[in-house]
Amino acid sequence: MQLTSQAFSYGRPIPKKYSCQGVGISPPLSFSDIPSEAKSLALIVEDPDVPANVREDGLWIHWIVYNLSPIVSNLAEGAQIFAVQGINTAGEIGYCPPCPPDAKHRYYFYAYALDVVLPEEEGVTKEQLLEAMEGHILATAELMGTYEQD
């Protein structure tokens, strides 16, 4: 399975438009080589570079999406999501744009192909989603971009 974006390549800067300094919409994403037996897809976006004085665990969850149809190969930028979204670290449901307070941060986009459609419960946390996916992950993919405020 592969996860790519038309907006940035692995390890490269995420354009400002997708950050708190821009429009703050989600970037375009493309899923490919999805296992044929997949029943759903999930996506977790996180920043592991958060200063300890902001988050003790150093992690900020930017987006949680699950029960995406495996026939959806693309999410357009700012796309309306026809799936279930979880709660991000800001305490909101939906995409939380990159907005690092101190320096360049890395943003990891993790995609999962699952052999089930998960029970729908809006507002789940990353931990709850990972627990629900346990034993059902067929394939994974990763995309990482960076962002640093001007």
Curated annotation (Swiss-Prot):
It comes from the Bacteria. Signal peptide: none annotated. SUPFAM superfamilies: PEBP-like. NCBIfam families: YbhB/YbcL family Raf kinase inhibitor-like protein. Belongs to the UPF0098 family. This is UPF0098 protein TC_0109. It comes from Chlamydia muridarum (strain MoPn / Nigg).
